[in-house]
Amino acid sequence: MTAQTPIHVYSEIGKLKKVLLHRPGKEIENLMPDYLERLLFDDIPFLEDAQKEHDAFAQALRDEGVEVLYLETLAAESLVTPEIREAFIDEYLSEANIRGRATKKAIRELLMSIEDNQELIEKTMAGVQKSELPEIPAAEKGLTDLVESSYPFAIDPMPNLYFTRDPFATIGTGVSLNHMFSETRNRETIYGKYIFTHHPIYGGGKVPMVYDRNETTRIEGGDELVLSKDVLAVGISQRTDAASIEKLLVNIFKQNLGFKKVLAFEFANNRKFMHLDTVFTMVDYDKFTIHPEIEGDLRVYSVTYENEELRIVEETGDLAELLAANLGVERVELIRCGGDNLVAAGREQWNDGSNTLTIAPGVVVVYNRNTITNAILESKGLKLIKIHGSELVRGRGGPRCMSMPFEREDI
């Protein structure tokens, strides 16, 4: 990494030097049972314990020599002038689906009154309950303001933010600022926009942009994996469509970030397999975790760029052999989540047994709860850093989902 390229990620397994996290905040306390599906949650984490688990995750990374950055801090540091701060507030409000002009005005006044930038950022993440706003004078109310709704929020919270992997993805020296699957999560990408536009270190054009949040097709970071300095993997999943992948790849190849080939994985379109990294992660030079349930229906395409056009070939051979050939190793071992037991595989995949964060070759952060998968990984010679995640896992994401590498050593 140089001062001109503050992002440097050319593998999934190179020693992790710098990573971005988001500590769960008050947005979690704005979850309620009636609206879990709307906010893409299945359950409500206990915030106090979720924060303790997340702090322990961050400390485990620091203990391994990783510098931990926080999304909320970088976003706050990006509001470098009053004009940029006001522009951020107005853009945030324009994307918040606020019902009623008077309500929008009241929220704007609330946000403008917050003097501390980090407090402002955290408030935008938490959302705004209607009960927080002052009573609007009858003369100022429009029809939308007058028609009462039982929905308690003037602005929805963003409870998925602690999964920092998805709103944007670091690829080589560049970043994919994603357009996400749901309206609920797409609002999260505003923080990445301001970081990579205005932050003193990461803004000002220092980081090439290979995808833009204003695109209309969807892509998420859990479907973007950097296998080596030459090869990327992308998932065609519930959250990422093929059209987005084509746009992303054209931009990556045109900007000459160094990649020569992309492996596109097409698999079942459902919530339990929402991203490629929930069923497939790289843990060593020649080892991957995989969820056995995707193996039968998996289709893989090799994508290269020739004469300013994408060249796409469907691969029909063995997946392990395909990976070995593309990574330049003699053989690749696919380690099944839950082993050969379908019950264990289903349970531990649901609890993100396949969603590992590799912080050095063969050194992997995992949830301690996935005991069968963890025992198999250890039997293969991997060093596991086990973290508690009983509350964090309720959001359906593991250590890789909760982290966005900013710098890795080359391998």
UniProtKB/Swiss-Prot annotation:
<comment type="similarity">
    <text>Belongs to the arginine deiminase family.</text>
</comment>
<dbReference type="InterPro" id="IPR003876">
    <property type="entry name" value="Arg_deiminase"/>
</dbReference>
<comment type="pathway">
    <text>Amino-acid degradation; L-arginine degradation via ADI pathway; carbamoyl phosphate from L-arginine: step 1/2.</text>
</comment>
<keyword id="KW-0963">Cytoplasm</keyword>
<feature type="active site" description="Amidino-cysteine intermediate">
    <location>
        <position position="401"/>
    </location>
</feature>
<keyword id="KW-0056">Arginine metabolism</keyword>
<protein>
    <recommendedName>
        <fullName>Arginine deiminase</fullName>
        <ecNumber>3.5.3.6</ecNumber>
    </recommendedName>
</protein>
<dbReference type="GO" id="GO:0005737">
    <property type="term" value="C:cytoplasm"/>
</dbReference>
<keyword id="KW-0378">Hydrolase</keyword>
<dbReference type="GO" id="GO:0019546">
    <property type="term" value="P:arginine deiminase pathway"/>
</dbReference>
<dbReference type="Pfam" id="PF02274">
    <property type="entry name" value="ADI"/>
</dbReference>
<dbReference type="GO" id="GO:0016990">
    <property type="term" value="F:arginine deiminase activity"/>
</dbReference>
<dbReference type="GO" id="GO:0019547">
    <property type="term" value="P:arginine catabolic process to ornithine"/>
</dbReference>
